[in-house]
């Protein structure tokens, strides 16, 4: 059984097609790249995979369980699903709302009900991993674009998801931050954890993913 299974997915914004007849299987531990021109539907597909929007028609299964508007009304089911999929938005700023970097990173684990000592360990570990320790007490609105990006990623990986999905991972990063993030993504892939990235950077796809899925201008898989 595939970890992720999309069958004949269609999605429209105000009757304008954004995804057309999308069928896609992703195995546990696979690294998949999504490519396509602006407006092709990459970001829409990522939002659908994260359960933020739902198909107009077709089915989406995660670990053999259907993800739909109906099933996600179950609060326990929704919480379990979102704990397994980590999503870093293209605009990381929209994910940051706490008073400090450390508070941001601790927010997700607290929502999961983890003990404070475990939360402290997770925060410390991910801040060291991504080079955020020195700015732990800094407010997000005082961060550079690269620092915001790394903080958003830290928030996601502090929850130890099974799947990591990133929209334009290198967006807004300086050279040093790109190296840190690339090293992390390589380590994630080497650990055989599922990775899905959407990007225009062909070199990044070549370096990180097992296969590339192209979304065409017709909003289909090419």
Where are these regions (language model features)?
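Helix-to-loop junction immediately C-terminal to a conserved catalytic motif
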Residues: 50
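The feature captures the beta-strand-to-loop junction immediately N-terminal to the Walker
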Residues: 35-37
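Conserved ABC ATPase signature
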Residues: 139-143, 147
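Conserved ABC transporter NBD signature motif
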Residues: 58-70, 81
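H-loop/switch region of ABC-family ATPase nucleotide-binding domains
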Residues: 199-200
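Catalytic Walker B motif of ABC-type/P-loop ATPase nucleotide-binding domains
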Residues: 164-167
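Conserved ABC ATPase "signature" region
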Residues: 117-135
């Amino acid at each position: 059984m595939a970890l992720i299974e999309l069958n004949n997915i269609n999605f429209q914004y105000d009757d304008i097609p954004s995804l057309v007849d999308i069928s896609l299987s992703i195995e546990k531990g696979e690294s998949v790249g999504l490519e396509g021109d602006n407006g092709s539907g990459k970001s829409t597909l990522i939002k659908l995979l994260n359960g933020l929007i739902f198909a107009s028609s077709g089915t989406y299964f995660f670990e053999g369980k259907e993800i739909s508007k109906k099933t996600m009304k179950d609060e326990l089911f929704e919480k379990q699903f979102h704990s397994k999929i980590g999503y870093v938005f293209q605009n990381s700023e929209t994910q940051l709302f706490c008073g400090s970097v450390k508070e941001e990173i601790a927010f997700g684990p607290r929502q999961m009900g983890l003990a404070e000592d475990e939360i402290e360990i997770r925060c410390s570990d991910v801040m060291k991993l991504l080079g955020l320790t020195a700015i732990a007490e800094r407010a997000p609105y005082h961060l550079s674009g690269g620092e915001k990006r790394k903080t958003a990623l830290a928030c996601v990986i502090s929850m130890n998801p099974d799947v990591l999905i990133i929209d334009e991972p290198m967006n807004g990063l300086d050279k040093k931050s790109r190296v840190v993030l690339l090293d992390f993504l390589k380590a994630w892939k080497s650990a055989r954890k599922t990775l899905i990235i959407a990007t225009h950077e062909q070199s990044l796809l070549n370096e990180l993913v097992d296969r590339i899925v192209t979304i065409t201008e017709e909003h289909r898989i090419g």
